[in-house]
């Protein structure tokens, strides 16, 4: 399995392209947000001779879904995400405006990761593990020693993780 991380959009979201020796690829958390970023992702796919077969998301926040509609149109691939996060797609424009990020067309979900135990492509299997917290439909995708976790560590929020309680424990304060 090979993995590439591309960072997109003003929020600096990480998009992962995962593929194996069959050249079949899954794009995880497609955050490409404009024609320049769409082209960067398309060029990466072309330069590596990849055949995208699925766009999959760890959760439904706008910064992780901005590029999914492009992938669905360009490559004719389905989109997999928990339907528990579908409401976030409906509210993406409002969420984006809060962060000053224009949000275009949001995709429809083709495969519900709540009822999908694994994603298979080429010779690769990604196990789908449900991790609600950051969003109601949050999932992580596990393959061997690699875990694609999106924003799972941000339970109920986004941004830096606070280690205040750890510092207090370490110092006895």
Which ranges hold each PLM region?
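A short acidic, helix-capping loop that chelates divalent metal ions and anchors anionic groups
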Residues: 88-91, 156-162
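Active-site HxH/HxHxD metal-binding segment of metal-dependent hydrolases
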Residues: 32-38, 42-121
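Well-ordered beta-strand scaffold positions
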Residues: 117, 124, 145-146, 152, ...
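Short catalytic-loop micro-motif centered on adjacent basic/acidic residues
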Residues: 26-29, 54-57, 128-130
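Conserved small/polar residues in nucleotide/adenosyl-binding loops
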Residues: 164-171
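Active-site metal-binding loops of divalent metal-dependent hydrolases
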Residues: 30-32, 60, 134-135, 145-146, ...
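Conserved beta-strand hairpin/beta-sheet module of binuclear metal-dependent hydrolase folds
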Residues: 1-48, 140-150
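Core dinuclear metal-dependent hydrolase active-site scaffold
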Residues: 3, 17, 116-142
